[in-house]
Structure formats: C-alpha cells, structure tokens
Amino acid sequence: MSRRVRRGGLRVAVPKQETPVSKFLTASGTFQDDDIKLNHTGLRVVSSEPNLPTQTQSSSPDGQLSIADLELVRFLGKGAGGTVQLVRHKWTNVNYALKAIQMNINETVRKQIVQELKINQVTHQQCPYIVECFHSFYHNGVISMILEYMDRGSLSDIIKQQKQIPEPYLAVIASQVLKGLEYLHQVRHIIHRDIKPSNLLINHKGEVKISDFGVSAVLVHSLAQRDTFVGTCTYMSPERLQGRSYAYDSDLWSLGLTLLECALGTFPYKPAGMEEGWQNFFILMECIVNQPPAAASPDKFSPEFCSFIESCIRKCPSERPSTTDLLKHPFLQKYNEEEYHLSKIL
C-alpha cells in the first residue's frame, strides 16, 4: 500500500509507513540522521568522513527550484522505500525526476537513503558522468530528491528494446561509465557497489551517467577495502560473494558483466536448466565463484572487445586494471565516439 502527499499542488506517492520517524526529528522538525541535517530548505552535511565536505548547504539553481513550482507529468517507477515521478518546472518547462522516500522505513533502507544523500551532495555539479541531484529536502515525513531526468531510461531498457547493443556503441558506453568511475574512485574514493544495467542511465543526447548511490561506500584512502555485503548479488565480484574484503576493482567486475550482458542480450552466467527459485540462485552464485569467468566469444566479437571483457572479469581482484588503464584499452580507441553516437540507437 502507498499514500499520497499533496505538496504545493503536486501529489507525491510514497510507500506506506512502517516504523516511527519521530526519533530522527529535531524540535524544529529537521530530519537528522548520522551526519546529515535535512529540512524544507535543503541539506546540510557535517561529516567526519575525510572525502566529504565538513559543512555543505544544498541550494537550488538560482534559488528557483522548489517543490511548489513542480507539476506531475507521470509516474516513472518505484523501489525500496520510494517512488520516482517525472515532474516539470512550471516556469522553465525543464523536466526532472522526483524521487520521494517515506522515512518510516526499515533501518537498512533508511541508511541507504542517507548515504545516497551524502554522495549526491559531494558529487553535485562535479562530474558530467554522474546523474546530478539538484536539490533535496525533508517535509512531512518524506525526503525528496530533485534529480536530473535521463529521458531514454537505462541500459536495461535499451537491452529490452534492442536485444543486443552493437560493439561500437558499447565502446562509447564503456568510455563514459569508466570516466564516471574514475572520478568516484580516484577523486572521491567511493566504491559504487551496484553497477548494473538498470543503474546506468541515458539521455537523448547520448550521455551515459551513473545513478543510485544508496549502497555506495566511501573509503578512507585509495588503498582501503570494505567487507560488507550490499548491492545486487548477480553482478557482484567473486570476492564479494565470498564475503572477502574488496575495493574499487569490484566495480570493474560489475561493469564487465554489464557490458557483456549488453552485447549478448542476456545475463552472461546462466547454468544449464536454470529456473527461478532460491536453489538455482545459489547455483548461479556458486558458478560465479567456482567456475571460469564469463567471456565474450571470439567467434562473435572483436579481439579488442574480448580482451576488454577479460580484463574486467578477472577473478583475482589485483589482476584487474584500474579505470585509468581501461580508458587506454585498444577497445575504446577502436571506435570514434562521433561516428557511433548513442543517439543513433535510442
């Protein structure tokens, strides 16, 4: 079940409340959790994490962007704890994606939302390969994020429409995603931890951007590692599935699987006779951990593409190249981005 909250003429649909949010509210009605403070005017981060600003106040472009100035166009989708709607700014006719999260949700989802808020804040206007969050605020039990609208959907949508994405366009996609990951890894020391087709969004200009930072992690320094188990299991690297420590290179495994899925039109790992159900889910996980890595067939793909995928999907994390090294890979140099502009397949 869900309820609808009317906000300045805009009806925001949010999931049904499950747990009290009152313990996260200050006397003034500000939502406070961990090191963020969020109210109707915006977001403030007071962070002890070395790669996040000590104090930051979110602001809308030119002070013009507010919930009262947005009108609903249509419903886009829903996920854990929230809904996403396409909205239009009444005065500029610019479209945005409005993500609304009811904060009376379970602790795991709440922590993911808080983490997403912090990372959205630190990456604001910093990297053209990351979906931008223009404004976020809290009001009446709902956290709202006004996000850049990517009007061609996700790579997952493209696969459903096209079945397979031709290799030259995959090179263009890989280049843009790697530039986004290079920024996250080397500048912000962030592991995304959930790279997959549905989290890579595209717009009509052919721009590919990374989205959804709910399960991302900030590392203390470039050599640090994590050992928590979050993200979409089917795209996890073997070391993560085994519960071992992991670092930035786990994102590259996920990217390799994602690109191979786009090339094949189906998920690369699919044991014979696989059917839906938990038993077969664990068989799939065992296959990823214990069997040789998935690979691009040299009979169907160029040597450069096969080499690129092999570089990403190496079971030993230390053998995977960095984002910087992969950006120099012959596969990305083989195709001209202008000639294979993504708008041609959208």
From Swiss-Prot:
The gene is MKK1c. This is Mitogen-activated protein kinase kinase 1c. GO terms for molecular function: ATP binding; MAP kinase kinase activity; protein serine kinase activity; protein serine/threonine kinase activity; protein tyrosine kinase activity. ATP binds at L76, G77, K78, G79, A80, G81, G82, T83, V84, K99. The lineage of its organism: Eukaryota, Viridiplantae, Streptophyta, Embryophyta, Bryophyta. Keywords: ATP-binding, Kinase, Nucleotide-binding, Plant defense, Serine/threonine-protein kinase, Transferase. It is an enzyme of class 2 (transferase). Pfam families: Pkinase. GO terms for cellular component: cytoplasm. The keyword Transferase applies. Belongs to the protein kinase superfamily. STE Ser/Thr protein kinase family. MAP kinase kinase subfamily. It catalyses: L-seryl-[protein] + ATP = O-phospho-L-seryl-[protein] + ADP + H(+); L-threonyl-[protein] + ATP = O-phospho-L-threonyl-[protein] + ADP + H(+); L-tyrosyl-[protein] + ATP = O-phospho-L-tyrosyl-[protein] + ADP + H(+).
